[in-house]
């Protein structure tokens, strides 16, 4: 949608970053959010895998870990809406809580593996 608002033309394929300057403000925020989502995924995915491995070896993890695993993706959806909608306080709260969820998964997964 942001490309259509930036009057996308085929010649823009030669220099896609130059077209970015013509994006509307919400389009730029959507692009930044997209990049940030990759960064968040690289932190959360290993935590989720660690928790899964711990659960397979030691049995079910505490409810807190399960809640954190489900809460993080939900928070990312709210984060995306807040980022594109330019609502920084909600965006910051979602980011911090999502980071906490990943931390909980790392903590509970390591605790289960080391104690089990």
Task: Show which residues each predicted segment covers.
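Structural signature of hydrophobic alpha-helical transmembrane segments
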Residues: 61-71
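Juxtamembrane "helix exit" motif at the C-terminal ends of alpha-helical transmembrane segments
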Residues: 47-60, 110
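Alpha-helical transmembrane segments of multi-pass membrane proteins
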Residues: 72-76
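Cytosolic, membrane-interface loops and tails of multi-pass inner-membrane proteins
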Residues: 1-31
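Juxtamembrane boundary at the C-terminal end of a transmembrane helix
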Residues: 105-116
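Core segments of transmembrane alpha-helices
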Residues: 35-51
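Alpha-helical transmembrane segments
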Residues: 44, 48, 100, 104-107
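Interfacial loop-to-transmembrane junctions
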Residues: 77-100
């Amino acid at each position: 949608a942001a490309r259509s608002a930036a009057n996308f033309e085929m010649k823009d394929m030669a220099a896609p970053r130059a077209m970015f300057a013509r994006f509307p403000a919400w389009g730029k925020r959507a692009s930044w959010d997209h990049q940030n989502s990759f960064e968040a995924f690289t932190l959360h995915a290993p935590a989720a895998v660690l928790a899964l491995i711990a659960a397979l070896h030691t049995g079910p993890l505490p409810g807190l870990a399960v809640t954190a695993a489900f809460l993080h993706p939900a928070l990312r959806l709210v984060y995306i809406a807040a980022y594109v909608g330019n609502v920084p306080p909600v965006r910051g709260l979602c980011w911090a809580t999502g980071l906490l969820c990943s931390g909980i998964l790392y903590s509970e997964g390591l605790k289960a593996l080391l104690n089990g």
